[in-house]
Amino acid sequence: MVMNFVRNLFFFVLAILSSFWISSFWIAQTFTPSSSYQPVEVIDGAGLYKKQRTDGNEAYLQVIDLHKMQIDQLVGEVDDMGLGQGKYYQGEGKHYSPFFKMKLFNEVTDEYKELYSHTVFSLINCSFFEQYKSSTQLSFPIKFNGEVITGGHSPYGPVSQPADKFYSNIRLKALVWDDAGAYITDYDPATGAPLNESRVKNAIVSYQYSDHPAKVLGKNQANRFHVIGTLDFDGIKGDELLLIMTVNRATLDEAADLLRQLGVKGEIITIDGGSSTYLFNSRKGNIILPQPANQEDNPTFRKLPHYLGFRTRDKKPVSPLIKVSQPADKVQVEQNKPYLILWRDNLDSDVTIELYDGDKRIEVISPRTASNGVYEWTPKSPVKEGYSLRISSLKNRKIFGTLQL
């Protein structure tokens, strides 16, 4: 009997130790690329690596663990809503396609660091856009913290009269992410799926890398590109890793092949590249900068409308801030028509949105709404020139941002 007791106790302890070892093994595991990728910065939840390619050019790999990292969409304020101009959300002409302010990359980066301090890991440019002016429409739909903020306006896509017949029947792709992981799937412009699903809070629509006009119409020339894929590394259902490959000179096929070599088996998308390509890292600084083809002819080229920021979910206190920039041109707000109020904040509580005439409050637009940077407002009465919008912290009304109308 004593021997049975000892034996059972031994196996019980062994089972506990084995369970602990296995758990520790999986917890400790992190994705590490091959030795040809040299670490630039590696933190708990993210890594930036540099690869010197055989042709002398460079590739930068970012590995983002969505269980640990936050992705923020950073988009310029709206001056014109582009009502009825959306081409890719629930049918042509069924959604708006606003004009978003083009913002200088270093101003966006500086503001992001001001909001999130030491938690910032990196920034990249993101969405394709249509006009090289002070504000621009984005090419394809974006869902930002639960709100579809544009239906897209590109002529190079599956619309009734595309700029090139190749694009009549292509399948656009949606990159969807949340705290649990990310996936890339077919996008349906007729229904808006998957962006029309309430569970989807953040998503971008873009090209499968092989459908990018630079490959199809530009004969697949080498250039600067970002390509993005997802990867399951922890063995649990779903892809928790986002892999972003940024090349300073390569074809799209070569860039995508680098992701395949790292184990990406699913869809691979591309976002805006070429002269728009931007890559910033908190340790290294600006790695790849947007470049104008001709600074005199195209001074707005270094300004871009849409960025992605990556940061840790560190809860260390930072000074609470609400940041609002004045849109590029005069704001056009019309009675009974929607207008997107956009801002950035680092608050951990809700905000209130109010309409002011000077120091006089005219209307409470929303007594309480999430501090997520976006609110669609449809004014019920005429909005006079000179009115302003005020977004204030409910915890401390002295913390606010103002948008002049």
Regions found by a protein language model. Name each.
Residues 1-13:
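N-terminal Sec-pathway targeting helices
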Residues 10-23:
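Hydrophobic membrane-insertion alpha-helices, especially the h-region
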Residues 24-166, 245:
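Zymogen propeptides
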Residues 47-63, 74, 195-234:
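Conserved beta-alpha junction segments in alpha/beta enzyme cores
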Residues 123-126, 268-272:
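Active-site neighborhood of phospho(di)ester-bond hydrolases with catalytic His/Asp-centered motifs
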Residues 125-216:
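Active-site-adjacent helix-turn-beta-strand microarchitecture at beta-sheet edges
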Residues 133-159, 211-270, 276-318:
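Conserved, well-ordered active-site substructure
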Residues 320-405:
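Extended, solvent-exposed regions of the mature portions of secreted/cell-surface glycoproteins
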